[in-house]
Amino acid sequence: MQETVTTSALLDPSHSSVSTQDKSSTGGHTSSTGPQPSKPSITPVSAKSRNPHPGANFHRMRRIIAEDPEWSLAIVPLLTELCIQHIIRNFQNNPILKQMLPEHQQKVLNHLSPDLPLAVTSNLIDNENYWLRCCMQRWPVCHVAHHGGSWKRMFFERHLENLLKHFIPGTTDPAVILDLLPLCRNYVRRVHVDQFLPPVQIPAQLRPGDQSDSGSEGEMEEPTVDHYQLGDLVAGLSHLEELDLVYDVKDCGMNFEWNLFLFTYRDCHSLAAAIKACHTLKIFKLTRSKVDDDKARIIIRSLLDHPVLEELDLSHNLIGDRGARGAAKLLNHSRLRVLNLANNQVRAPGAQSLAHALAHNTNLISLNLRLNCIEDEGGQALAHALQTNKCLTTLHLGGNELSEPTATLLSQVLAINTTLTSINLSCNHIGLDGGKQLLEGMSDNKTLLEFDLRLSDVAQESEYLIGQALYANREAARQRALNPSHFMSTITANGPENSVG
């Protein structure tokens, strides 16, 4: 009997308590009728003395914890894990990464701190997940699509932009930016700076006895307001393709002064020299910076015969006819494809200069002159140029005081031009008759896809019928995109002389 109890206790620990209880209960009371079938009686055990059943803790009984990526059955960490932890802790002093196996590299990168010095990580780590963590730690909103889809490029571009926006000439050490260039030169392709701070100068208050004998205050030296000079920066970025600048000051508060918003001649000459020497620059934007005719011509002169420049944006400035003439000269001395002079002071003479250049141009595909004042004289000149131009696809003339004479000539353009796909004449005075003229021109046009005539005094019927013609053109363009082979076979069958539309 004892042997049976012992064996059952080894096989089933829960049964041992029952057998022991049976033995203790029968030891004190001997049955007079002889041995009887034993009826085990279980005495309640107090909660304090109750031992938990091993199966009660389900987590302890599981052999694999799949939801824990760090779980390991081994009680002692593997030597490789200990080495990886040591490398992570001492990565700043001894950056070991390339010599490791790929799976070990990934473990190290997943646990590296985003606060490591850029001198250690910039040219060593290319893993996008690491730079994703660096970006998300610094900026709550991240549009990686604006940076070519690369988190590493985004980090260095925004980090450099942040340094430039808070650089104070005469106060900030230029080495802060210059030391960064060797680390980011291979990754920065776009620089967008919407603020340039002027020098911090506390003007000395004159006392009554401090004035000169003549009493003139003109001998006082004017405080300089030149901003950070971009020459060294642009020269150090060997892959720079886009430069987007705004000489402005944000959040100036009670320290507001008009000279905080000056784009000085020294700034202009320095910037012109920098972009002239940058032979990789494709897009240049200088907006909302109070650029007048003289400064615009300095900038444009530096861009003549630029090898790769494709887009120039000088919108929201103070450029007049002289600046527009400089831009017209640039059209035929560059590979410019997009020109934006919106919200400036260009009038009819400037528009005529642009029209003369446009008539012989073979590169420009987009011209934006909205919110100027070219009037009908300038609008008619542009319409005449479009009768011979074969490359422009987008024309924006909104808010230019245009009226029926310009609409009449544009209707003739619509009948013969086969390259324009978008025209904007909103916020003008086209009128009822002008709308009818444009509708007549649209009846022969098969390529225009967008035509904005809002707030131009065109009759609703004319606007509706023009919209129907545009819808037919868009549907035909969609069919051509879906079946290009069928479209080409139709052109071949009809001959090139009937291929228009």
Swiss-Prot record:
Which UniProt keywords are present, listed alphabetically? Answer: Cell projection, Cilium, Cytoplasm, Cytoskeleton, Flagellum, Leucine-rich repeat, Repeat
Q: Name one GO cellular component term.
A: sperm flagellum
Record's keyword annotation contains Metal-binding: no
UniProt lists compositionally biased (Low complexity) regions at 24-34
Where does the protein principally reside? other
* Chain spans, region Disordered: 1-56, 203-222
Listed Polar residues bias regions: 1-23, 35-49
Name of a matching Pfam family: LRR_6
Span of the secretion signal? none
**Do you know which InterPro entries this protein is assigned to?**
DRC5, Leu-rich_rpt, LRR_dom_sf
Q: Which compartments does it reside in?
A: Cell projection, Cilium, Flagellum; Cytoplasm, Cytoskeleton, Flagellum axoneme
Read off the CDD domains from this record.
LRR_RI (cd00116)
Q: Which Gene3D superfamilies match?
A: Ribonuclease Inhibitor
- On whether Cell division is a keyword of this UniProt record, the answer is no
**Alphabetical GO biological process terms:** flagellated sperm motility
From the UniProt record, list the LRR repeat ranges.
308-321, 335-355, 363-383, 391-411, 419-439
- Which family is annotated? Belongs to the DRC5 family.
What is said about its interaction partners and assembly? Component of the nexin-dynein regulatory complex (N-DRC). Interacts with DRC1. Interacts with FBXL13/DRC6, DRC3 and DRC7.
Q: What is this protein called?
A: Dynein regulatory complex subunit 5
